[in-house]
Amino acid sequence: SPYTLEEVVARNYLINEHPDVILNIVDGTNLERNLYLTTQLTELGIPVVMAINMMDIVKKNDDKINVKELSRELGVTIVEISALKGNGIMDAAEAALQAAKVGRTIPMHTFSGAVEHAIAHIEEAVLHDMPEDQQRWYAIKIFERDDKVLAKLNLSKEVLAHIEKDIQAAEKELDDDAESIITNERYIYIASIIKGCYKKKTAGKLSTSDKIDKVVTN
């Protein structure tokens, strides 16, 4: 869920304006941190193209990103770029145009059984009149009890009470609150992807992003 003003504005634009395609630029030297947003973007029903930036530095460090496998795991087209050197920019733009023609991105990630049961029930009970490609994102946000989404949908007390039973059942089974369940399961999913797709030669060495963060926060 977004908390900063910038995140709220960006999310509202994507949901309300429903652009033809999302070009998701991620830092290849700190891939794991960036994938959390990517998993959310793929649930919006909008085609997603990932541009992995700083690939020149990734290769210089002799790290390995299995782009083909990463693309398969996430269900998105991936292009390697170096914004600083201007490499791959046109390829990313062309990939975005092609993705817009093809249509929606199908999210590859599924949550645990209890969560998926609740999400399916929410889609059926609340979101059946909404465009199909937007239903999953809204259902996940309802499951998380996202205040802004609930305010926008303005659901009746009866409907809220109905779906709350499934949410509470998932919370009881997984022994956590709904928002934390979604967050934790995303991170577990991302960790499994990184394990299979990202090999870091310089284990223990700080990435460029981490170095910047360290300077800024000290």
Regions found by a protein language model. Name each.
Residues 1:
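Conserved nucleotide-sensing/catalytic segment adjacent to the nucleotide-binding pocket
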Residues 5-79:
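Conserved C-terminal guanine-recognition region of P-loop GTPase G domains, centered on the G4
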Residues 49, 59-203:
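Alpha-helical transmembrane helix bundles of large polytopic membrane transport and channel proteins
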Residues 209, 213-217:
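Alpha-helical membrane-interface segments at transmembrane helix boundaries
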